[in-house]
């Protein structure tokens, strides 16, 4: 019975873990739990059951747990009978994928070579080895594998794509584009082929073409293929290029609601809340979608623009459609607090905590309400919970330090928190998110703050919010520099009016310069950024 159940679950999970949703699987999933229990029973009964090791390795790979996946596939390969060449080759292929995910490319290449020694015409192994050789810059060797694939199948999209990538990286853009066109023409209605081509276009610095391909993929399947996620990722590298591409395609197809949704999301992710709001308005007015996420996102933008009455109406609509969403209640609390309704804010945040009590943003929201109520001890208690929930998040320490310093008048405790921020590793890919410059400034370590500024500006990708952070850092000891960096933040589209003009719960604030005429002049100059 157990064996039959394992086979049944394994068959389902093979499809599940090789689908586009594989990396979203979690151990909380009932099917995954059942599968893992069966695998454990099978291995307890037979510790050398290579097929079970292989199946569980594939499951761990699907969950993104590469360490456990590697351990299991090592055991599978160890116990696989050498006469079962096809299955053993599959095991080497899986281990190569795991090793590639871990960045161990040379070991992955060794496994792909082993798979091809067992089965010389293994198509997936040829494709994977070609891709890996391309990644390693061994283009001549990669070309051999792709041509081998093409001889086996003259309609192999993988071969055309691989050869196009080789040509792109060896200075043959015209030939690369021709090969890409051949690949797409084999299945012009398949959105995934446009995702693949967009990646190669991006590698060729052809961002308009890359964006157009992703937009077309969205139009084919409303973004289910992952095109939306790729557009959002591309926007972090080439924001203007992605927005220009979306603008161009919206002009061509003004009734494509999903394009407005994507553009609104990207505007919001880059703190241009007024532009994002315009797209959410279009979606609602044109009745493109009636999702609760639309009303949540519109409420979020409205709240950042301090239009609290409208924001409240929208977030309540979202809650009507999804009444157990912790973030929706947290945002309602933020809106009520921003509008001065602390009792209503407290009621909303209590409801948020019912659904997600250890959520950092909810803990911070509770702390801010307590701060506004003058209950600084309670505020610190809430910030303590935020620190416990996410000990590597610097903002929680800064909020707690600020409350210690100005609420409790405990400079010693505040300094301890500022120094704690300096000790954090900073796991975010964006350098500015470590907020160390602000901690240096609060500790009056001016030279170190200036060094952080230089490191941030040299980090390769300075976001509009990074200029805002620098404005906050200098607000306490160099007004001219603070104003200059605020100007740069606004010039680059930083449109969070609430954070610029209202927020006062931590040193990540412009409170020290808000009384200045230069500050008021800047807000007037960029008033369109705030929809004013």
Q: What residue ranges belong to the model's regions?
A:
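Helix-start (N-cap) detector for alpha-helical repeat units in TPR-like alpha-solenoids
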Residues: 50-51, 84-85, 89-90, 123-124, ...
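Position-specific recognition of the canonical hydrophobic site in helix A of tetratricopeptide repeat
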Residues: 61, 93, 100, 127, ...
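Alpha-helical protein-protein interaction modules
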Residues: 240, 250-258, 262, 388, ...
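Structural marker of alpha-solenoid helical repeat scaffolds
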Residues: 45, 79-83, 118, 152, ...
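Canonical tetratricopeptide repeat
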Residues: 55, 87-90, 94, 128, ...
């Amino acid at each position: 019975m157990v064996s039959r159940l394992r086979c049944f679950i394994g068959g389902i999970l093979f499809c599940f873990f090789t689908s586009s949703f594989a990396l979203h699987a979690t151990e909380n999933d009932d099917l995954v739990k059942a599968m893992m229990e069966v695998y454990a029973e099978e291995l307890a009964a037979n510790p050398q059951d290579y097929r079970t090791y292989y199946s569980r390795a594939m499951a761990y790979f699907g969950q993104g747990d590469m360490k456990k996946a590697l351990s299991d596939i090592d055991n599978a390969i160890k116990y696989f009978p050498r006469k079962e060449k096809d299955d053993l080759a599959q095991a080497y292929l899986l281990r190569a994928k795991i090793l590639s995910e871990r960045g161990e490319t040379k070991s992955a290449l060794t496994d792909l070579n082993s798979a091809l020694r067992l089965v010389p015409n293994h198509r997936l192994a040829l494709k994977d080895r070609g891709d890996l050789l391309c990644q390693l810059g061994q283009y001549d060797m990669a070309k051999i594998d792709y041509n081998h694939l093409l001889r086996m199948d003259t309609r192999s999209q993988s071969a055309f794509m691989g050869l196009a990538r080789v040509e792109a990286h060896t200075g043959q853009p015209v030939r690369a584009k021709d090969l890409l066109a051949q690949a797409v023409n084999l299945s012009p209605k398949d959105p995934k082929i446009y995702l693949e081509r967009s990646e190669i276009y991006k590698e060729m610095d052809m961002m308009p073409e890359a964006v157009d391909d992703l937009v077309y993929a969205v139009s084919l399947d409303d973004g289910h293929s992952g095109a939306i996620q790729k557009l959002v990722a591309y926007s972090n590298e080439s924001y203007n290029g992605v927005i220009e591409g979306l603008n161009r395609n919206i002009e061509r197809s003004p009734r494509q609601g999903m394009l407005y949704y994507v553009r609104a999301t990207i505007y919001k992710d880059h703190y241009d809340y007024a532009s994002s709001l315009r797209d959410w308005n279009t979606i609602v007015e044109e009745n493109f979608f009636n999702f609760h996420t639309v009303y949540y996102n519109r409420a979020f933008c409205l709240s950042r623009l301090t239009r609290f009455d409208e924001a409240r109406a929208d977030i309540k609509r979202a809650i009507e459609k999804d009444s157990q969403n912790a973030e929706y209640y947290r945002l309602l609390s933020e809106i009520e607090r921003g509008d001065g309704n602390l009792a209503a804010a407290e009621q909303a945040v209590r409801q948020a905590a019912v659904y997600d009590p250890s959520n950092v943003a909810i803990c911070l929201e509770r702390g801010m309400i307590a701060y506004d109520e003058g209950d600084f001890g309670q505020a610190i208690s809430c910030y303590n919970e935020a620190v416990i929930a996410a000990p590597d998040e610097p903002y929680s320490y800064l909020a707690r330090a600020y409350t210690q310093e100005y609420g409790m008048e405990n400079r010693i405790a505040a300094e301890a928190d500022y120094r704690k921020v300096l000790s954090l590793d900073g796991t975010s890919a964006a350098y500015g998110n470590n907020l160390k410059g602000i901690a240096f400034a609060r500790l009056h370590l001016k030279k170190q703050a200036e060094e952080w500024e230089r490191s941030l500006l040299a980090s390769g990708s300075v976001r509009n919010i990074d200029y805002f952070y620098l404005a906050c850092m200098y607000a306490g000891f160099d007004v001219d520099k603070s104003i200059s960096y605020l100007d740069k933040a606004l010039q680059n589209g930083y449109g969070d009016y609430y954070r610029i003009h209202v927020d006062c719960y931590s040193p990540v604030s412009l409170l020290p310069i808000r009384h200045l005429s230069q500050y008021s002049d800047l807000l007037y100059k960029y008033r369109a950024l705030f929809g004013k």
